[in-house]
From Swiss-Prot:
One of its GO terms (biological process) is sporulation resulting in formation of a cellular spore. In the phosphorylated form it could act as an anti-anti-sigma factor that counteracts SpoIIAB and thus releases sigma f from inhibition. It comes from Bacillus subtilis (strain 168). PROSITE patterns: STAS. This is Anti-sigma F factor antagonist. Gene3D superfamilies: STAS domain. Residues 3-113 form the STAS domain. The modification Phosphoserine is found at S58. It comes from the Bacteria.
């Protein structure tokens, strides 16, 4: 299975919705698309919706951590939302939720960043 990447900008927030599998085959594509958007759009924060992501490996964690560091460097924040149980377990084991905020829904994530959805 491949990775579907849907991105749009709401005010200064890049909303990323992933579907399918984020692994060593697809991680570089996500990295490039997000980096391009951060460079061309006026992005301050990232909301990462993982509701329809069925699988993720350590390559996916690495890409997410890298984008987290990128957005933190400009004083922004990353919020993960609507995560599937299997992927949530990976986040819990890796300790990423100690540094990246989690919200139940994309709407709630946007509200925490000061954007009305």
């Amino acid at each position: 299975m491949s990775l579907g990447i849907d991105m749009n900008v709401k005010e200064s927030v890049l909303c990323i919705r992933l579907t399918g599998e984020l692994d060593h085959h697809t991680a570089e594509t996500l990295k490039q698309k997000v980096t391009q958007s951060l460079e061309k759009d006026d992005i301050r924060h990232i909301v990462l919706n993982l509701e329809d992501l069925s699988f993720m490996d350590s390559s996916g964690l690495g890409v997410i951590l890298g984008r987290y560091k990128q957005i933190k460097q400009i004083g922004g924040e990353m919020v993960v939302c609507a995560i599937s149980p299997a992927v949530k377990r990976l986040f819990d084991m890796s300790g990423l939720f100690k540094i990246i905020r989690f919200e139940q829904s994309e709407q709630q994530a946007l509200l925490t960043l000061g954007v009305a959805s």
